[in-house]
Amino acid sequence: MSKILVAEDNPPNRELIREILEACGHEVIEAGDGRQALDKLEENLPDLVLLDIQMPVLDGYAVVREVRKTPRLATLKVLALTAYAMQGDREKVLEAGFDGYLTKPVDMVSLSKQIAQLLR
């Protein structure tokens, strides 16, 4: 299926997301912080990035800004994974350059739907 980079600093969350994605047949690349995410993007060009907003070293906003200004990566689909669920958070995430928004805790149905929409 698709190659997906999961950038999430919380190991149990990252493991859960990896298990869901692998069960759906996706190849998973993992990163534990924003800097690692950018390094992994240089090594592997995935079909999609699942990017936590709150991460050490570089947060998700800094990573998506870097992705959007890098010609080779600019059209890459990036889905925000966030605990932020207040009014206006979704709009802020989309305005920052993300292609989609999913709140945590992540459930398999919502994640699968978002991935299918973004990979069309």
What are the functions of these language-model segments?
Residues 8:
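Conserved acidic carboxylate
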Residues 15-23:
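Charged docking surfaces used in two-component/phosphorelay signaling
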Residues 30-39, 60:
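Helix N-cap/capping motif at the beta->alpha junctions
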Residues 44-50:
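Active-site beta3 strand of CheY-like receiver
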Residues 55:
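Receiver (REC) domain active-site loop signature in two-component systems and cognate sites
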Residues 106-115:
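C-terminal output helix
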